[in-house]
């Protein structure tokens, strides 16, 4: 399974309604940027949202993923920002 597919699979396992935009920033598969929209972020501070995502990725954060930039939004925030 490609790393991109595994990232999406794991995030959606933790946040089943998640809509994920994922971009490989370097082409090498180790630096990623993700925009994740989920109702599961409702009522959570940004750091709690990030912990949820990093927790879902588990050991991938200690191996193939060297860096991950996150933007985590609720559906309302996504709508307000035009996403």
Locations of regions flagged by a protein language model:
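N-terminal first-folded block
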Residues: 1-29
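A short interface-forming secondary-structure element
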Residues: 33-48
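Short loop/turn motifs enriched for small/polar and acidic residues
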Residues: 25, 37, 71-75
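Hydrophobic aliphatic residue packing
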Residues: 7, 20, 36-37, 53
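C-terminal structural segments of small proteins and small subunits
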Residues: 50, 54-83
